[in-house]
């Protein structure tokens, strides 16, 4: 089998999210505000950034505690039009207010950028 050489029209991106120790140290008011802000920040990624969300996964039932590195707590797999859109989506964590803080106090995001896998996807 020969590897495909064509370049896709979009970037395949895995956004990986990890909760910080501050999330676990926060009181109920801050946790509830963070959860609300997170939902609002990441709604309508298609309309705002042209991203097609292919799926998401939350592994918080088996991953307990802060996520300083791999494995992360949650993931979004998306086709994103370009690197600028990937950066803008990551910046949501930096820019979104949570009471007197920003999301990045409670959650971190990392993006892995590639292309669609050529095997095992059908």
Regions found by a protein language model. Name each.
Residues 1-72, 80-84, 114-122:
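Short S/T/G/P-rich N-terminal loop/turn motif that feeds into the first structured element of a domain
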Residues 44-45, 102-106:
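Short, conserved catalytic or adaptor-binding loops enriched in Gly and charged residues
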Residues 76:
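Conserved, mostly hydrophobic/aromatic
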Residues 83-91:
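Short amphipathic alpha-helices within nucleic acid-binding modules
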Residues 93-104:
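A common structural junction motif
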Residues 105-116:
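Conserved catalytic core of two-metal-ion nucleotidyltransferases
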């Amino acid at each position: 089998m020969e590897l495909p050489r064509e370049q896709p029209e979009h970037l395949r991106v895995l956004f990986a999210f990890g909760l910080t120790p501050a999330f676990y140290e926060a009181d109920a008011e801050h946790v509830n505000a963070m959860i609300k802000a997170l939902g609002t920040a990441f709604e309508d990624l298609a309309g705002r950034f042209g991203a097609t969300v292919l799926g998401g996964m939350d592994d918080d039932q088996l991953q307990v505690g802060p996520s300083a590195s791999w494995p992360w707590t949650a993931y979004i797999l998306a086709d994103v039009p370009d690197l600028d859109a990937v950066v803008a989506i990551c910046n949501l964590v930096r820019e979104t207010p949570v009471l007197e803080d920003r999301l990045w106090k409670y959650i971190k995001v990392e993006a892995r950028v590639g292309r669609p896998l050529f095997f095992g996807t059908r």
